[in-house]
A protein has these predicted regions:
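A short, conserved alpha-helix within the catalytic core of class I
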Residues: 89-98, 102
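Class I SAM-dependent methyltransferase SAM/SAH-binding core
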Residues: 27, 31-68
Length: 110
């Protein structure tokens, strides 16, 4: 697992609801689920990566965060994670606003 993911995992407490935005192949999600007993969900725009996550037994939906995050209720997750994805957005400020709205705590790494 990448060092960055190790740092993020140290921040997140056990038995929490976590949303991983731009979750990639689900490496961080799988760790948080198996080692910390977190209820982890993912949002990923790339169909092939969504399929990899599903094959790992992870709960991931395919979608664009700039369009999909608005649908999540306020403070519906204990933690929202955005790792190495911010630069990919056309409107990063709006994405950050949504992350702060959805999560009780938000973790962003660049």
């Amino acid at each position: 697992m990448k060092k960055e993911f190790e740092v993020i995992a140290q921040i997140i407490q056990n038995n929490k609801r976590v949303l991983d935005v731009g979750c990639g192949d689900g490496t961080l999600m799988e760790y948080l689920k198996l080692n910390q007993r977190n209820d982890v969900r993912g949002l990923e725009p790339q169909k092939d990566l969504v399929q990899k996550c599903i094959a790992r037994g992870l709960s991931v939906i395919e979608g664009d965060a700039e369009k999909e995050l608005i649908q999540f209720p306020k403070k519906s997750f204990d933690y929202v994670v955005l790792s190495q994805t911010l630069q990919a957005f056309l409107y990063p400020e709006e994405v950050l606003d949504q992350l702060l709205r959805i999560g009780k705590q938000t973790i962003v790494s660049i």
